């Protein structure tokens, strides 16, 4: 009895020690949260606010994230088979709210979809109201880019939804090849993918491309009431025009945003608006199109856009100086009829400099209070490439209550990394996703970071 009593005492003492440790850790996190400010990493997510995931002991890059109704995160990107860049697959991972992989999804939280013999890159993801996951991108033969739109739908458990397209996969072929960069849902459940279509492809030279949109019925079949058999393409000035983002307005109109170029101003921000049947809306901009130059023969490209409740469109991307020495985050805001909004930074556009070369914003988010979050990174040209975030006030000035002077830089280590996508949680926190190189094998992993935002 004395031995049993002694063991029970040791157990009770050990239990009290564990309980005390748990209380201390809880108090530590609580104090951290109480002292935290908007833009700080969220210590309740992953390790100190960061998560890295090796999907295949190869090169993995996360491109986009979507939030489920239950708070879980769906992250999509590409993974290379044995680091063979001609054999990329769609990769999807789902995370619990604390940043751990959700083992109820796919195999230990991960799904891989192969397109045999093709380089396949998913660019965007959206969650349907029924929990199904729609991923859009492209698949092509390496160095030819003679590929197609690929739209894949997964069941909530990560299996392919065989009621959609051909075994869960829809392939849309445009002339000369195409690629989807974004996807969105209409209120009626129809799916719109947007990207680029090659009109004339010249390897090693400047190609002729147009904005490309495709709309699908709920089962993945083309919507014949949209454009020409479910497809629309739009030319700006006969050169390289690419749509990177697509929005649906409450009135059913569709806005595509990206870049267009000509010999005079080189690449500019570009936007086009369509009626619900896919025809150009001539009440927007000039003949349904808008171009915005950030000065001289710059390389300016919009990568993401968001729609304000008042109908104004915010676009973000990058602007490169004429001599190529500096590339900054670039943001433009348009009125509902496609004119630069002069109440935003006096001329409708602004740039954000993080102090090093070659920064690009890849995602824009709108807070409920009207403030603007831009997320991105550098272009892999130095070991100083990090996740970059900035917050703007409604009129375009940096919000100095966010991070340091309105800007946040997050490093995962001394090697290259950057953010490609972001989303808000229901509590306002920001989740950014991208990639991070590792010392272990010099390849890259999915990288996630979560930030506090009181909005």
Where are these regions (language model features)?
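Sec-dependent signal peptide hydrophobic core
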Residues: 12-23
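N-terminal secretory signal peptides that target proteins for export/translocation
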Residues: 1-14
């Amino acid at each position: 009895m004395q031995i049993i009593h002694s063991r029970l005492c040791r157990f009770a003492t050990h239990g009290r020690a564990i309980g005390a440790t748990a209380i201390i850790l809880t108090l530590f996190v609580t104090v951290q949260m109480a002292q935290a400010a908007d833009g700080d990493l969220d210590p309740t997510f992953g390790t100190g606010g960061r998560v890295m995931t090796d999907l295949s002991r190869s090169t993995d890059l996360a491109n986009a994230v979507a939030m489920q109704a239950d708070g879980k995160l769906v992250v999509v990107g590409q993974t290379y088979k044995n680091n063979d860049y001609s054999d990329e697959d769609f990769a999807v991972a789902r995370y619990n709210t604390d940043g751990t992989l959700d083992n109820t999804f796919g195999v230990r939280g991960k799904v891989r979809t192969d397109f045999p013999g093709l380089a396949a890159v998913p660019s965007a993801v959206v969650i349907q109201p029924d929990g199904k996951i729609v991923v859009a991108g492209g698949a092509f033969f390496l160095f030819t880019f003679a590929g197609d739109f690929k739209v894949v739908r997964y069941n909530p458990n990560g299996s392919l939804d065989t009621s959609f397209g051909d075994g869960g996969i829809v392939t849309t072929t445009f002339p000369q090849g195409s690629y989807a960069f974004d996807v969105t849902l209409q209120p009626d459940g129809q799916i719109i993918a947007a990207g680029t279509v090659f009109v004339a492809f010249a390897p090693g030279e400047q190609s002729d491309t147009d904005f490309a949109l495709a709309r699908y019925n709920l089962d993945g079949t083309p919507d014949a009431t949209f454009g020409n058999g479910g497809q629309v393409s739009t030319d700006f000035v006969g050169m390289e025009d690419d749509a990177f983002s697509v929005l649906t307005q409450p009135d059913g109109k569709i806005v595509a945003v990206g870049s267009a170029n000509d010999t005079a101003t080189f690449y500019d921000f570009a936007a086009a608006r369509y009626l619900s049947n896919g025809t150009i809306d001539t009440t927007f901009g000039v003949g349904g199109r808008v171009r915005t130059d950030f000065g001289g023969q710059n390389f300016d490209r919009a990568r993401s856009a968001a729609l304000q409740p008042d109908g104004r469109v915010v676009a973000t991307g990058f602007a490169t100086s004429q001599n190529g020495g500096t590339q900054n985050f670039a943001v433009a805001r348009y009125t509902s009829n496609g004119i630069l909004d002069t109440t935003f930074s006096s001329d409708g556009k602004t740039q954000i400099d993080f102090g090093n070369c070659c920064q690009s914003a890849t995602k824009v988010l709108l807070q409920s209070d009207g403030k603007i979050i831009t997320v991105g990174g550098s272009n892999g040209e130095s070991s100083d490439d990090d996740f970059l975030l900035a917050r703007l006030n409604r009129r375009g000035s940096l919000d100095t209550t966010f991070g340091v002077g309105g800007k946040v830089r997050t490093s995962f280590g001394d090697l290259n990394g950057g953010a490609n996508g972001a989303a808000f949680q229901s509590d306002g926190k920001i989740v950014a996703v991208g990639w991070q190189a590792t010392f272990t094998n010099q390849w890259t992993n999915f990288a996630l970071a979560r930030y506090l935002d009181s909005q």
